[in-house]
Design a protein with these regions (language model features):
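Basic, polyanion-binding surface patches
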Residues: 1-157
Length: 157
């Protein structure tokens, strides 16, 4: 998630996410240069990673196929923005995990920017659930939802 300079929150479905460092803990996310979320993160220097469960597949797909410049994704999906402990970017109450990050480096590559965010706080829900992933055609994943050429799934049991 991110927040724009006027305080409007936004969500994005990110397929390019990885742990980039152990100590200090850093995540890297790759976001298209044309993305509103990328603009927000570049301007604000922070973001939050929200890990949804499989029950949120349709909401995640909506966030990945609509622009935050045109719609309020929280209002349209019915998801709940909650304040984090450190960053202004909102957490998502319904998600299994939320991680607050401060940008420590940005790297432009091709049509994407990679933001490296140091973890400054994290939250794990007490609810049990299977995390939702953006998947391709690889073996080992259970397809949960597919739309507009995008596939969401989870690791097979």
């Amino acid at each position: 998630t991110s927040i724009d300079p006027e305080g409007k929150p936004n969500m994005i479905a990110v397929g390019w996410l990885m742990r980039a460092n152990m100590e200090p803990p850093v995540f890297a996310i790759g976001i298209n240069n044309k993305s509103r979320s990328g603009e927000n993160i570049a301007a604000g220097g922070e973001f939050a990673i929200a890990v949804p469960g499989v029950e949120l597949a349709q909401q995640v797909m909506y966030c990945g196929t609509h622009s935050g410049g045109e719609v309020d994704k929280f209002a349209e999906t019915g998801l709940t923005a909650v304040a984090g402990k450190v960053v202004k970017a909102p957490l998502v109450e319904e998600c299994l995990v939320n991680v607050e990050c401060k940008v420590v480096k940005t790297q432009e590559i091709g049509d994407h920017r990679v933001f490296f965010g140091e973890v400054v706080a994290s939250w794990v829900s007490e609810r049990e659930g299977k995390p939702l992933l953006i998947v391709g055609q690889e073996e080992g994943y259970e397809l949960v939802y597919e739309e507009k050429g995008f596939r969401l799934g989870t690791v097979k049991d």
